[in-house]
Protein backbone atom coordinates (compact mmCIF):
# COMPACT_ATOMS: atom_id res chain seq x y z
CA UNK A 1 0.00 0.00 0.00
CA UNK A 2 1.20 3.51 -0.72
CA UNK A 3 0.17 7.11 -0.96
CA UNK A 4 -1.37 7.55 -4.42
CA UNK A 5 0.96 9.71 -6.55
CA UNK A 6 -1.59 10.27 -9.33
CA UNK A 7 -4.48 11.84 -7.43
CA UNK A 8 -4.81 15.03 -5.48
CA UNK A 9 -3.52 14.83 -1.94
CA UNK A 10 -0.23 14.62 -0.12
CA UNK A 11 1.40 12.49 -2.86
CA UNK A 12 1.31 15.15 -5.59
CA UNK A 13 3.96 17.50 -4.19
CA UNK A 14 6.57 14.79 -4.74
CA UNK A 15 5.82 14.66 -8.49
CA UNK A 16 7.94 17.73 -9.22
CA UNK A 17 11.04 15.94 -7.89
CA UNK A 18 10.53 12.95 -10.18
CA UNK A 19 11.98 11.93 -13.50
CA UNK A 20 11.00 14.31 -16.37
CA UNK A 21 10.51 13.53 -20.07
CA UNK A 22 9.02 15.30 -23.11
CA UNK A 23 6.28 14.31 -25.57
CA UNK A 24 7.67 13.52 -29.04
CA UNK A 25 4.56 12.13 -30.76
CA UNK A 26 0.79 11.98 -30.16
CA UNK A 27 -1.48 9.57 -32.08
CA UNK A 28 -4.95 9.67 -30.52
CA UNK A 29 -4.74 8.16 -27.01
CA UNK A 30 -1.14 6.95 -27.53
CA UNK A 31 1.86 9.16 -26.62
CA UNK A 32 5.57 8.71 -27.33
CA UNK A 33 7.77 10.29 -24.65
CA UNK A 34 11.57 10.82 -24.64
CA UNK A 35 13.43 10.57 -21.29
CA UNK A 36 17.05 11.41 -20.37
CA UNK A 37 19.52 8.51 -20.88
CA UNK A 38 19.44 6.02 -18.00
CA UNK A 39 16.15 7.37 -16.59
CA UNK A 40 13.63 5.22 -18.44
CA UNK A 41 10.39 4.45 -16.53
CA UNK A 42 9.29 0.84 -16.03
CA UNK A 43 6.44 -0.84 -17.91
CA UNK A 44 3.04 0.04 -16.29
CA UNK A 45 4.52 3.10 -14.56
CA UNK A 46 2.09 6.00 -14.30
CA UNK A 47 3.07 9.22 -16.11
CA UNK A 48 1.46 12.64 -15.57
CA UNK A 49 1.33 15.41 -18.21
CA UNK A 50 0.72 18.83 -16.68
CA UNK A 51 0.57 22.19 -18.42
CA UNK A 52 -1.75 24.53 -20.32
CA UNK A 53 -3.26 24.21 -23.78
CA UNK A 54 -3.34 26.94 -26.46
CA UNK A 55 -6.26 28.78 -24.80
CA UNK A 56 -4.69 28.64 -21.33
CA UNK A 57 -6.82 25.78 -19.93
CA UNK A 58 -5.15 23.58 -17.30
CA UNK A 59 -4.22 20.08 -18.54
CA UNK A 60 -3.71 17.09 -16.26
CA UNK A 61 -3.50 13.79 -18.16
CA UNK A 62 -2.40 10.48 -16.60
CA UNK A 63 -0.84 7.85 -18.88
CA UNK A 64 0.45 4.31 -18.44
CA UNK A 65 3.72 3.06 -19.95
CA UNK A 66 3.08 0.18 -22.38
CA UNK A 67 6.30 -0.16 -24.39
CA UNK A 68 10.00 0.73 -24.23
CA UNK A 69 10.92 1.69 -27.82
CA UNK A 70 14.70 2.15 -27.50
CA UNK A 71 16.63 5.41 -28.08
CA UNK A 72 15.38 6.59 -24.64
CA UNK A 73 11.75 6.66 -25.83
CA UNK A 74 8.65 4.99 -24.38
CA UNK A 75 5.08 4.58 -25.63
CA UNK A 76 2.19 5.21 -23.22
CA UNK A 77 -1.62 5.08 -23.31
CA UNK A 78 -3.60 8.03 -21.91
CA UNK A 79 -6.36 7.43 -19.33
CA UNK A 80 -8.25 10.60 -20.33
CA UNK A 81 -8.70 12.70 -23.48
CA UNK A 82 -5.47 13.96 -25.07
CA UNK A 83 -7.09 17.17 -26.42
CA UNK A 84 -4.75 20.14 -26.03
CA UNK A 85 -1.55 18.12 -25.63
CA UNK A 86 1.41 19.25 -27.76
CA UNK A 87 4.84 17.91 -28.66
CA UNK A 88 7.51 19.12 -26.29
CA UNK A 89 5.23 19.16 -23.23
CA UNK A 90 6.78 18.01 -19.96
CA UNK A 91 5.90 14.51 -18.67
CA UNK A 92 6.48 13.43 -15.06
CA UNK A 93 7.29 9.80 -14.22
CA UNK A 94 5.62 9.00 -10.89
CA UNK A 95 7.91 5.99 -10.42
CA UNK A 96 5.02 3.66 -9.57
CA UNK A 97 2.03 1.97 -11.25
CA UNK A 98 -1.40 3.60 -11.20
CA UNK A 99 -2.77 3.26 -7.65
CA UNK A 100 -6.36 3.63 -6.44
CA UNK A 101 -8.01 4.11 -3.01
CA UNK A 102 -9.12 0.91 -1.26
CA UNK A 103 -10.92 0.02 1.95
CA UNK A 104 -14.18 0.89 3.69
CA UNK A 105 -14.11 4.56 2.68
CA UNK A 106 -14.66 3.57 -0.99
CA UNK A 107 -18.16 2.23 -0.18
CA UNK A 108 -21.04 4.41 -1.33
CA UNK A 109 -18.80 6.35 -3.73
CA UNK A 110 -18.38 6.50 -7.53
CA UNK A 111 -14.85 6.43 -8.96
CA UNK A 112 -13.21 6.78 -12.35
CA UNK A 113 -10.32 4.65 -13.62
CA UNK A 114 -7.76 6.73 -11.66
CA UNK A 115 -9.60 6.17 -8.37
CA UNK A 116 -10.78 9.80 -8.30
CA UNK A 117 -14.30 10.29 -6.89
CA UNK A 118 -16.73 11.65 -9.51
CA UNK A 119 -19.89 11.94 -7.37
CA UNK A 120 -19.30 15.50 -6.07
CA UNK A 121 -19.16 14.27 -2.46
CA UNK A 122 -15.63 15.51 -1.79
CA UNK A 123 -12.33 13.62 -1.48
CA UNK A 124 -12.12 10.02 -0.26
CA UNK A 125 -11.22 9.76 3.39
CA UNK A 126 -8.32 7.30 3.06
CA UNK A 127 -4.59 7.34 2.47
CA UNK A 128 -4.51 3.57 1.76
CA UNK A 129 -4.08 2.86 -1.94
CA UNK A 130 -3.17 -0.20 -3.95
CA UNK A 131 -1.59 -0.61 -7.43
CA UNK A 132 -4.00 -1.87 -10.10
CA UNK A 133 -1.44 -4.35 -11.50
CA UNK A 134 -0.86 -7.35 -9.22
CA UNK A 135 -0.15 -11.03 -9.65
CA UNK A 136 -2.92 -13.59 -9.08
CA UNK A 137 -3.03 -15.47 -5.73
CA UNK A 138 -0.74 -18.52 -5.54
CA UNK A 139 -2.32 -21.90 -6.25
CA UNK A 140 -1.85 -23.00 -2.63
CA UNK A 141 -3.94 -20.04 -1.38
CA UNK A 142 -7.03 -20.92 -3.42
CA UNK A 143 -10.24 -22.21 -1.86
CA UNK A 144 -11.93 -25.23 -3.45
CA UNK A 145 -15.20 -25.54 -1.49
CA UNK A 146 -18.39 -25.95 -3.57
CA UNK A 147 -21.60 -24.20 -2.58
CA UNK A 148 -24.55 -22.82 -4.54
CA UNK A 149 -25.38 -19.13 -4.77
CA UNK A 150 -29.19 -18.73 -4.88
CA UNK A 151 -30.31 -15.86 -7.14
CA UNK A 152 -34.12 -16.10 -6.95
CA UNK A 153 -34.27 -16.36 -10.78
CA UNK A 154 -35.88 -19.69 -11.73
CA UNK A 155 -34.05 -20.46 -14.98
CA UNK A 156 -30.64 -19.67 -13.45
CA UNK A 157 -31.10 -21.55 -10.16
CA UNK A 158 -32.52 -24.66 -11.85
CA UNK A 159 -30.49 -25.11 -15.06
CA UNK A 160 -27.17 -23.27 -14.59
CA UNK A 161 -26.70 -22.64 -10.84
CA UNK A 162 -24.03 -20.17 -9.77
CA UNK A 163 -21.11 -21.11 -7.56
CA UNK A 164 -20.37 -19.06 -4.45
CA UNK A 165 -16.91 -17.64 -5.06
CA UNK A 166 -17.08 -18.53 -8.76
CA UNK A 167 -17.01 -16.68 -12.06
CA UNK A 168 -20.26 -16.31 -13.96
CA UNK A 169 -20.77 -14.97 -17.49
CA UNK A 170 -23.97 -13.56 -19.02
CA UNK A 171 -23.58 -13.98 -22.80
CA UNK A 172 -25.80 -12.18 -25.28
CA UNK A 173 -25.90 -9.99 -28.38
CA UNK A 174 -27.07 -6.38 -28.48
CA UNK A 175 -30.44 -5.74 -26.84
CA UNK A 176 -31.34 -9.19 -25.45
CA UNK A 177 -31.27 -8.16 -21.78
CA UNK A 178 -27.75 -8.60 -20.31
CA UNK A 179 -27.77 -5.34 -18.36
CA UNK A 180 -31.34 -5.84 -17.07
CA UNK A 181 -30.37 -9.34 -15.88
CA UNK A 182 -27.18 -8.11 -14.19
CA UNK A 183 -29.15 -5.30 -12.50
CA UNK A 184 -31.72 -7.87 -11.29
CA UNK A 185 -28.88 -10.00 -9.89
CA UNK A 186 -27.47 -6.92 -8.13
CA UNK A 187 -30.98 -6.25 -6.77
CA UNK A 188 -31.56 -9.84 -5.57
CA UNK A 189 -28.06 -10.68 -4.34
CA UNK A 190 -26.45 -7.40 -3.23
CA UNK A 191 -29.46 -6.45 -1.08
CA UNK A 192 -29.68 -9.85 0.63
CA UNK A 193 -25.90 -10.36 0.68
CA UNK A 194 -24.34 -9.45 4.01
CA UNK A 195 -20.94 -8.52 2.58
CA UNK A 196 -19.84 -5.77 0.22
CA UNK A 197 -20.14 -5.41 -3.55
CA UNK A 198 -18.05 -3.66 -6.19
CA UNK A 199 -19.66 -2.78 -9.51
CA UNK A 200 -17.47 -1.98 -12.53
CA UNK A 201 -19.09 -0.22 -15.49
CA UNK A 202 -16.72 -0.94 -18.38
CA UNK A 203 -17.59 0.83 -21.63
CA UNK A 204 -21.36 0.77 -21.14
CA UNK A 205 -24.01 3.53 -21.28
CA UNK A 206 -23.68 6.43 -18.83
CA UNK A 207 -27.48 6.32 -18.36
CA UNK A 208 -27.27 2.73 -17.07
CA UNK A 209 -24.59 3.75 -14.57
CA UNK A 210 -26.78 6.59 -13.36
CA UNK A 211 -29.86 4.30 -13.13
CA UNK A 212 -27.88 1.79 -11.06
CA UNK A 213 -26.64 4.52 -8.69
CA UNK A 214 -30.18 5.87 -8.18
CA UNK A 215 -31.54 2.38 -7.60
CA UNK A 216 -28.81 1.61 -5.06
CA UNK A 217 -29.74 4.78 -3.16
CA UNK A 218 -33.47 3.97 -3.22
CA UNK A 219 -32.91 0.43 -1.94
CA UNK A 220 -30.54 1.54 0.85
CA UNK A 221 -27.49 -0.34 -0.50
CA UNK A 222 -25.97 3.16 -0.70
CA UNK A 223 -26.86 5.06 2.48
CA UNK A 224 -26.95 8.80 1.69
CA UNK A 225 -27.37 9.85 5.33
CA UNK A 226 -24.41 7.81 6.55
CA UNK A 227 -22.22 6.95 3.56
CA UNK A 228 -19.96 4.72 5.72
CA UNK A 229 -22.84 2.22 6.12
CA UNK A 230 -23.11 1.68 2.34
CA UNK A 231 -22.50 -1.80 0.91
CA UNK A 232 -21.24 -1.04 -2.62
CA UNK A 233 -18.45 0.83 -4.42
CA UNK A 234 -19.06 1.89 -8.04
CA UNK A 235 -16.27 2.28 -10.61
CA UNK A 236 -17.22 3.67 -14.01
CA UNK A 237 -15.36 4.00 -17.30
CA UNK A 238 -18.28 4.51 -19.67
CA UNK A 239 -18.39 4.30 -23.47
CA UNK A 240 -17.57 8.01 -23.90
CA UNK A 241 -14.19 7.49 -22.20
CA UNK A 242 -10.97 7.00 -24.21
CA UNK A 243 -9.85 3.37 -24.72
CA UNK A 244 -7.10 3.65 -22.08
CA UNK A 245 -9.71 4.22 -19.36
CA UNK A 246 -11.97 1.41 -20.60
CA UNK A 247 -8.97 -0.93 -20.76
CA UNK A 248 -8.02 -0.34 -17.11
CA UNK A 249 -11.30 0.42 -15.27
CA UNK A 250 -11.97 -3.32 -14.78
CA UNK A 251 -8.62 -3.61 -12.98
CA UNK A 252 -9.52 -0.60 -10.78
CA UNK A 253 -12.78 -2.28 -9.68
CA UNK A 254 -10.99 -5.62 -9.16
CA UNK A 255 -8.26 -3.98 -7.02
CA UNK A 256 -10.93 -2.54 -4.69
CA UNK A 257 -12.61 -5.97 -4.45
CA UNK A 258 -9.28 -7.72 -3.75
CA UNK A 259 -8.65 -5.47 -0.73
CA UNK A 260 -11.97 -6.51 0.85
CA UNK A 261 -11.09 -10.17 0.18
CA UNK A 262 -7.43 -10.18 1.25
CA UNK A 263 -7.21 -7.56 4.00
CA UNK A 264 -10.75 -7.40 5.43
CA UNK A 265 -11.25 -11.16 4.76
CA UNK A 266 -14.78 -10.63 3.45
CA UNK A 267 -16.94 -12.31 0.80
CA UNK A 268 -17.22 -9.84 -2.08
CA UNK A 269 -19.53 -9.60 -5.08
CA UNK A 270 -17.90 -8.17 -8.22
CA UNK A 271 -20.18 -7.11 -11.07
CA UNK A 272 -18.57 -6.22 -14.40
CA UNK A 273 -20.71 -4.79 -17.18
CA UNK A 274 -19.30 -5.39 -19.82
CA UNK A 275 -16.14 -7.50 -20.02
CA UNK A 276 -16.17 -7.44 -23.86
CA UNK A 277 -15.64 -3.66 -23.81
CA UNK A 278 -12.38 -4.33 -21.94
CA UNK A 279 -11.30 -6.50 -24.90
CA UNK A 280 -12.51 -3.94 -27.45
CA UNK A 281 -10.58 -1.15 -25.73
CA UNK A 282 -7.43 -3.28 -25.85
CA UNK A 283 -8.09 -3.87 -29.54
CA UNK A 284 -8.43 -0.11 -30.17
CA UNK A 285 -5.01 0.73 -28.75
CA UNK A 286 -3.26 -2.45 -29.93
CA UNK A 287 -2.74 -1.27 -33.52
CA UNK A 288 -1.63 2.18 -32.31
CA UNK A 289 0.99 0.43 -30.18
CA UNK A 290 2.33 -1.15 -33.37
CA UNK A 291 1.12 -4.73 -32.82
CA UNK A 292 -0.03 -6.86 -35.75
CA UNK A 293 -3.77 -7.62 -35.44
CA UNK A 294 -4.77 -11.23 -34.79
CA UNK A 295 -8.02 -13.12 -35.63
CA UNK A 296 -10.97 -10.86 -36.59
CA UNK A 297 -8.77 -7.81 -35.95
CA UNK A 298 -8.37 -8.45 -32.21
CA UNK A 299 -5.10 -7.81 -30.41
CA UNK A 300 -2.57 -10.69 -30.48
CA UNK A 301 -2.32 -10.45 -26.66
CA UNK A 302 -6.07 -11.15 -26.15
CA UNK A 303 -5.65 -14.40 -24.16
CA UNK A 304 -2.90 -12.91 -21.97
CA UNK A 305 -4.89 -9.75 -21.16
CA UNK A 306 -8.05 -11.73 -20.37
CA UNK A 307 -6.10 -14.27 -18.29
CA UNK A 308 -4.31 -11.62 -16.21
CA UNK A 309 -7.69 -10.10 -15.26
CA UNK A 310 -9.68 -13.33 -14.76
CA UNK A 311 -7.05 -15.21 -12.73
CA UNK A 312 -7.14 -12.47 -10.08
CA UNK A 313 -10.92 -12.93 -9.70
CA UNK A 314 -10.83 -15.94 -7.41
CA UNK A 315 -11.55 -17.20 -3.91
CA UNK A 316 -8.80 -17.71 -1.35
CA UNK A 317 -8.77 -19.11 2.18
CA UNK A 318 -9.14 -15.52 3.48
CA UNK A 319 -12.28 -14.57 1.55
CA UNK A 320 -14.10 -14.95 -1.74
CA UNK A 321 -14.89 -12.91 -4.85
CA UNK A 322 -18.02 -14.03 -6.67
CA UNK A 323 -17.96 -12.30 -10.02
CA UNK A 324 -20.85 -11.83 -12.44
CA UNK A 325 -19.77 -10.52 -15.83
CA UNK A 326 -21.86 -9.46 -18.81
CA UNK A 327 -20.27 -10.57 -22.08
CA UNK A 328 -21.33 -8.88 -25.33
CA UNK A 329 -21.49 -11.37 -28.23
CA UNK A 330 -20.81 -9.57 -31.54
CA UNK A 331 -23.44 -10.49 -34.18
CA UNK A 332 -24.70 -13.27 -31.82
CA UNK A 333 -21.62 -15.33 -32.76
CA UNK A 334 -20.36 -17.25 -29.72
CA UNK A 335 -17.26 -18.33 -31.67
CA UNK A 336 -16.03 -14.71 -31.89
CA UNK A 337 -12.58 -14.52 -30.17
CA UNK A 338 -13.81 -12.20 -27.34
CA UNK A 339 -16.63 -14.43 -25.95
CA UNK A 340 -14.72 -17.62 -26.87
CA UNK A 341 -11.70 -16.50 -24.78
CA UNK A 342 -13.98 -15.56 -21.86
CA UNK A 343 -15.76 -18.97 -21.85
CA UNK A 344 -12.62 -20.79 -20.72
CA UNK A 345 -12.44 -18.87 -17.42
CA UNK A 346 -16.04 -19.31 -16.19
CA UNK A 347 -17.76 -21.69 -13.75
CA UNK A 348 -21.24 -20.97 -15.13
CA UNK A 349 -22.46 -19.48 -18.40
CA UNK A 350 -25.90 -17.96 -18.86
CA UNK A 351 -26.53 -17.62 -22.60
CA UNK A 352 -29.26 -15.21 -23.70
CA UNK A 353 -31.21 -16.07 -26.86
CA UNK A 354 -32.53 -13.55 -29.40
CA UNK A 355 -35.22 -16.08 -30.41
CA UNK A 356 -36.65 -16.18 -26.87
CA UNK A 357 -36.43 -12.37 -26.57
CA UNK A 358 -38.41 -12.09 -29.84
CA UNK A 359 -41.12 -14.33 -28.30
CA UNK A 360 -41.29 -11.96 -25.31
CA UNK A 361 -39.91 -14.53 -22.86
CA UNK A 362 -37.77 -12.67 -20.32
CA UNK A 363 -35.21 -13.37 -18.98
CA UNK A 364 -34.36 -14.69 -22.46
CA UNK A 365 -32.04 -17.39 -21.08
CA UNK A 366 -31.41 -20.32 -23.44
CA UNK A 367 -32.08 -23.45 -21.30
CA UNK A 368 -30.00 -25.66 -23.63
CA UNK A 369 -27.08 -23.26 -24.23
CA UNK A 370 -26.51 -22.31 -20.57
CA UNK A 371 -24.10 -24.47 -18.56
CA UNK A 372 -22.70 -24.76 -15.05
CA UNK A 373 -19.98 -26.86 -13.45
CA UNK A 374 -22.19 -26.96 -10.33
CA UNK A 375 -24.99 -29.01 -11.92
CA UNK A 376 -23.81 -32.34 -10.48
CA UNK A 377 -25.83 -34.68 -8.21
CA UNK A 378 -23.17 -34.63 -5.45
CA UNK A 379 -23.33 -30.79 -5.29
CA UNK A 380 -26.98 -29.85 -5.97
CA UNK A 381 -28.60 -33.14 -4.89
CA UNK A 382 -30.38 -35.87 -6.89
CA UNK A 383 -33.80 -34.14 -6.90
CA UNK A 384 -32.49 -30.87 -8.37
CA UNK A 385 -30.24 -32.65 -10.89
CA UNK A 386 -32.99 -35.01 -12.06
CA UNK A 387 -35.50 -32.16 -12.51
CA UNK A 388 -32.99 -30.03 -14.44
CA UNK A 389 -32.09 -32.92 -16.78
CA UNK A 390 -35.76 -33.71 -17.49
CA UNK A 391 -36.47 -30.03 -18.25
CA UNK A 392 -33.53 -29.99 -20.68
CA UNK A 393 -34.63 -33.28 -22.31
CA UNK A 394 -38.18 -31.98 -22.81
CA UNK A 395 -36.88 -28.69 -24.24
CA UNK A 396 -34.48 -30.55 -26.55
CA UNK A 397 -37.25 -32.84 -27.87
CA UNK A 398 -39.47 -29.79 -28.53
CA UNK A 399 -36.61 -28.15 -30.44
CA UNK A 400 -36.19 -31.29 -32.59
CA UNK A 401 -39.93 -31.40 -33.37
CA UNK A 402 -40.25 -27.72 -34.35
CA UNK A 403 -39.38 -28.33 -38.03
CA UNK A 404 -41.99 -31.11 -38.28
CA UNK A 405 -44.59 -28.88 -36.59
CA UNK A 406 -43.80 -26.01 -38.98
CA UNK A 407 -44.30 -28.23 -42.07
CA UNK A 408 -47.02 -30.73 -41.05
CA UNK A 409 -48.63 -29.18 -37.97
CA UNK A 410 -49.20 -30.55 -34.45
CA UNK A 411 -51.88 -33.04 -35.55
CA UNK A 412 -49.32 -35.20 -37.38
CA UNK A 413 -47.34 -35.86 -34.19
CA UNK A 414 -47.78 -38.97 -32.06
CA UNK A 415 -49.78 -38.70 -28.83
CA UNK A 416 -46.58 -38.86 -26.78
CA UNK A 417 -44.88 -36.11 -28.81
CA UNK A 418 -47.96 -33.86 -28.58
CA UNK A 419 -47.84 -34.22 -24.79
CA UNK A 420 -44.09 -33.44 -24.80
CA UNK A 421 -44.68 -30.29 -26.90
CA UNK A 422 -47.51 -29.11 -24.61
CA UNK A 423 -45.33 -29.56 -21.50
CA UNK A 424 -42.28 -27.98 -23.19
CA UNK A 425 -44.33 -24.88 -24.09
CA UNK A 426 -45.49 -24.63 -20.46
CA UNK A 427 -41.88 -25.04 -19.27
CA UNK A 428 -40.70 -22.36 -21.73
CA UNK A 429 -43.26 -19.90 -20.37
CA UNK A 430 -42.68 -20.89 -16.74
CA UNK A 431 -38.96 -20.11 -17.21
CA UNK A 432 -39.99 -16.45 -17.71
CA UNK A 433 -40.24 -14.27 -14.62
CA UNK A 434 -41.18 -10.66 -13.78
CA UNK A 435 -38.13 -8.66 -12.60
CA UNK A 436 -38.00 -6.08 -9.81
CA UNK A 437 -35.85 -3.74 -11.92
CA UNK A 438 -38.25 -4.00 -14.89
CA UNK A 439 -41.43 -3.11 -12.94
CA UNK A 440 -41.50 0.36 -14.53
CA UNK A 441 -41.58 -1.21 -18.03
CA UNK A 442 -43.86 -4.23 -17.48
CA UNK A 443 -46.22 -2.98 -14.78
CA UNK A 444 -45.88 -6.42 -13.09
CA UNK A 445 -44.37 -6.57 -9.59
CA UNK A 446 -41.03 -8.43 -9.43
CA UNK A 447 -40.85 -11.96 -8.01
CA UNK A 448 -38.08 -13.75 -6.08
CA UNK A 449 -38.52 -17.55 -6.27
CA UNK A 450 -36.61 -19.80 -3.86
CA UNK A 451 -34.83 -22.89 -5.22
CA UNK A 452 -37.16 -25.39 -3.48
CA UNK A 453 -40.23 -23.65 -4.97
CA UNK A 454 -38.61 -23.64 -8.42
CA UNK A 455 -37.90 -27.40 -8.31
CA UNK A 456 -41.45 -28.15 -7.04
CA UNK A 457 -43.00 -26.11 -9.87
CA UNK A 458 -41.10 -27.87 -12.65
CA UNK A 459 -41.72 -31.30 -11.10
CA UNK A 460 -45.49 -30.63 -11.18
CA UNK A 461 -45.34 -29.62 -14.88
CA UNK A 462 -43.22 -32.67 -15.82
CA UNK A 463 -45.43 -35.09 -13.83
CA UNK A 464 -48.49 -34.08 -15.88
CA UNK A 465 -50.51 -32.78 -12.93
CA UNK A 466 -50.93 -29.40 -14.65
CA UNK A 467 -51.61 -30.66 -18.19
CA UNK A 468 -55.14 -29.22 -18.03
CA UNK A 469 -54.00 -25.62 -17.44
CA UNK A 470 -53.62 -23.20 -20.39
CA UNK A 471 -49.99 -22.37 -21.28
CA UNK A 472 -50.52 -18.58 -20.93
CA UNK A 473 -51.12 -19.16 -17.19
CA UNK A 474 -47.41 -19.98 -16.81
CA UNK A 475 -46.17 -16.79 -18.51
CA UNK A 476 -44.46 -14.13 -16.33
CA UNK A 477 -45.38 -15.58 -12.93
CA UNK A 478 -43.32 -16.37 -9.83
CA UNK A 479 -43.94 -19.80 -8.25
CA UNK A 480 -46.31 -22.52 -9.49
CA UNK A 481 -49.13 -21.48 -7.11
CA UNK A 482 -49.32 -18.15 -8.95
CA UNK A 483 -49.65 -20.04 -12.24
CA UNK A 484 -52.62 -22.08 -10.97
CA UNK A 485 -54.24 -18.91 -9.57
CA UNK A 486 -53.71 -17.17 -12.93
CA UNK A 487 -55.31 -20.15 -14.72
CA UNK A 488 -58.42 -19.83 -12.53
CA UNK A 489 -58.60 -16.09 -13.27
CA UNK A 490 -58.31 -16.76 -17.03
CA UNK A 491 -61.12 -19.31 -16.78
CA UNK A 492 -63.37 -16.83 -14.94
CA UNK A 493 -62.58 -14.12 -17.52
CA UNK A 494 -63.41 -16.42 -20.45
CA UNK A 495 -66.76 -17.39 -18.84
CA UNK A 496 -67.63 -13.71 -18.31
CA UNK A 497 -66.88 -12.95 -21.99
CA UNK A 498 -69.27 -15.70 -23.07
From Swiss-Prot:
Gene Ontology biological process terms in this record: proton motive force-driven mitochondrial ATP synthesis
Record EC number: 7.1.2.2
Residues where ATP binds: 172-179
InterPro entries membership: AAA+_ATPase, ATP-synt_VA_C, ATP_synth_F1_bsu, ATPase_a/bsu_AS, ATPase_alpha/beta_chains, ATPase_F1/V1/A1_a/bsu_N, ATPase_F1/V1/A1_a/bsu_N_sf, ATPase_F1/V1/A1_a/bsu_nucl-bd
UniProt cross-references to Pfam families, sorted A to Z: ATP-synt_ab, ATP-synt_ab_N, ATP-synt_VA_C
Membrane-topology descriptor: Peripheral membrane protein
Keywords: ATP synthesis, ATP-binding, CF(1), Chloroplast, Hydrogen ion transport, Ion transport, Membrane, Nucleotide-binding, Plastid, Thylakoid, Translocase, Transport
Gene Ontology MF terms: ATP binding; ATP hydrolysis activity; proton-transporting ATP synthase activity, rotational mechanism
Record GO cellular component, one term: chloroplast thylakoid membrane
PROSITE patterns on file: ATPASE_ALPHA_BETA
Catalytic activity: ATP + H2O + 4 H(+)(in) = ADP + phosphate + 5 H(+)(out)
SMART domains: AAA
Top EC class, one word: translocase
Subcellular location: Plastid, Chloroplast thylakoid membrane
Subunit structure: F-type ATPases have 2 components, CF(1) - the catalytic core - and CF(0) - the membrane proton channel. CF(1) has five subunits: alpha(3), beta(3), gamma(1), delta(1), epsilon(1). CF(0) has four main subunits: a(1), b(1), b'(1) and c(9-12).
Functional note: Produces ATP from ADP in the presence of a proton gradient across the membrane. The catalytic sites are hosted primarily by the beta subunits.
Family statement drawn from the similarity comment of this UniProt entry: Belongs to the ATPase alpha/beta chains family.
Name of the molecule in the record: ATP synthase subunit beta, chloroplastic
